Amino acid sequence: MAKVAVINRDLKRRKIVKKFEARRAELLATINDASVSDEDRHSARIKLQMLPRNASPVRLRNRCSLTGRPRGVYSKFGLGRGKLRDIAMSGEIPGMIKASW
């Protein structure tokens, strides 16, 4: 299981990304718009750089919601492969059965 501090750090980053999502989208639209003057685009670039680094969605990591495991996470369920198997085998996920061929 991942350390509690690492899990909390990821949750904090998710909250910050959500908070600045609209502002980042607005600035990026201004930067990528060719019809806007170069001065306005430059000022938008400076404002984007002034935002917190944790506001960038690139810094997020998909983690298991139960254990905090960073790898082997199925995004459809938000669970790591080990916990997904345990829960599926106990029949807690409707319609999920063990593969057999």
From Swiss-Prot:
<dbReference type="GO" id="GO:0005737">
    <property type="term" value="C:cytoplasm"/>
</dbReference>
<keyword id="KW-0694">RNA-binding</keyword>
<comment type="function">
    <text>Binds 16S rRNA, required for the assembly of 30S particles and may also be responsible for determining the conformation of the 16S rRNA at the A site.</text>
</comment>
<dbReference type="InterPro" id="IPR001209">
    <property type="entry name" value="Ribosomal_uS14"/>
</dbReference>
<dbReference type="GO" id="GO:0015935">
    <property type="term" value="C:small ribosomal subunit"/>
</dbReference>
<keyword id="KW-0699">rRNA-binding</keyword>
<dbReference type="GO" id="GO:0019843">
    <property type="term" value="F:rRNA binding"/>
</dbReference>
<protein>
    <recommendedName>
        <fullName>Small ribosomal subunit protein uS14</fullName>
    </recommendedName>
</protein>
<dbReference type="GO" id="GO:0006412">
    <property type="term" value="P:translation"/>
</dbReference>
<keyword id="KW-0689">Ribosomal protein</keyword>
<comment type="subunit">
    <text>Part of the 30S ribosomal subunit. Contacts proteins S3 and S10.</text>
</comment>
<dbReference type="InterPro" id="IPR023036">
    <property type="entry name" value="Ribosomal_uS14_bac/plastid"/>
</dbReference>
<dbReference type="GO" id="GO:0003735">
    <property type="term" value="F:structural constituent of ribosome"/>
</dbReference>
<dbReference type="Pfam" id="PF00253">
    <property type="entry name" value="Ribosomal_S14"/>
</dbReference>
<comment type="similarity">
    <text>Belongs to the universal ribosomal protein uS14 family.</text>
</comment>
<keyword id="KW-0687">Ribonucleoprotein</keyword>
